[in-house]
Amino acid sequence: MSLRLKLHNTLTREKSEFAPIDADNVRMYVCGPTVYDFAHIGNARPVIVFDVLFRLLRHVYGEDHVTYARNITDLDDKINARALRDYPHLPLNDAIHAVTKKTADQFHDDVAALGCLQPTVEPRATDYIAEMIYLIERLIERGHAYKAGGEVLFDTRSMADYGQLSKRPLDEQQAGARVAVEAHKKNPGDFVLWKLSSESEPGWESPWGLGRPGWHIECSAMAGRYLGEVFDIHGGGLDLIFPHHENEIAQSRCAHGTHVMANVWMHNGFVQVEGRKMSKSEGNFVTIYELLHTDKFGGRQWPGEVLRLAMLMTHYREPIDFSVKRLEEAERLLSKWPAAETSDAAADETVLEALADDLNTVAAVQALHALAHAANTDPSRLPAFAASAALLGVLPKKTEMDEAIVSAVDALVELRLEMLKAKNFAEADRLRDELSEKGIQLKDGKDKETGERTTTWELKR
């Protein structure tokens, strides 16, 4: 099967066939977390969406022919504030390290529980200050940046087609949208590339004094370092289109003299919680950790595969309402799928075609459910189901049980058989119910040779 991958490009507002710059090295960059606080459920969506795309690209082009870079922003004013709040007795750099390490470690645990593969590279902003300074110097040399008010700023008027991603005319890009308007700026939309640091802020030596980079230049430097001046796909949440991605494009194109930064720009939709915008003031703010390990949402903990499937049941470009009802629906669906091991079999064509159509995970999940139903009655379909489920990252795993537990279950099953022989049906039913509560599903039958009653059991998902 020759798969034709089509992706919706925010830059063109069209869905078109994807053609990589180099099929031997398909390159994708996705904006990762700012590690000042635990990731919330909205942060989980791009991680899951682009993990599916990563899996699909590896399937199409080969596992060794895809480079996926997802950064960690460990340099931000929010991090500084959290460090001063949580570790007031530590030196600043030690406090910042404590915050970023704890938060990044938790992020890695969270996304692993959501079934996400590790990206090929995961650069941290603080390791690429030299690359950021180099880009800023090039922008100044080329007339796209200037120093004013203790800052180095990008001159948005110096770029004729600034705003092509968001389609916002420059005159409309005034204050707001995380772009501060200050008197020393040439234009209201000019944004910070470098700013001076006080004694209570982290800083690095630069041609413009001790300071730190602006938010946008960080991703330009890291993407360029690992993927080159022009690469294939850049992804992130819808909220990053402006100003972050718009400004990434401006910096990278003007520094390198290219027509594009990435050929395809992809953005996932917003996440609401129980019909409302998620916010701490609304009381519906929930982290991935809380969903996995506490009873904050729906009065119980939720398995990572349930959270993942719940996300994939809506197309990535559509808004999603994250609710207990949605999670219960995803859990019911998963409970009907057979457990399986990873398979080298060919994935189902219907699932592949759905994913190749701009990551239509809704259609892919529907096709996978039909395949699961077939595999439940025809074991020969199980390898295709396993291969297809792995593309979505929702392959139900066989659960290994301790030998002592297996022996205990076998003993109860045998006891129930004895109760049935003795016509003590009430006790047999009680034992069945007891096993069911422990997640054990019984299947009664008859031995073909002796005609005696038999019972097999399996662990329910």
UniProtKB/Swiss-Prot annotation:
A motif ('HIGH' region) lies at residues 33-43. GO terms for cellular component: cytosol. Belongs to the class-I aminoacyl-tRNA synthetase family. The gene is cysS. Keywords: Aminoacyl-tRNA synthetase, ATP-binding, Cytoplasm, Ligase, Metal-binding, Nucleotide-binding, Protein biosynthesis, Zinc. Zn(2+) binds at residues 31, 219, 244, 248. It catalyses: tRNA(Cys) + L-cysteine + ATP = L-cysteinyl-tRNA(Cys) + AMP + diphosphate. ATP binds at residue 280. This is Cysteine--tRNA ligase. HAMAP family: Cys_tRNA_synth.
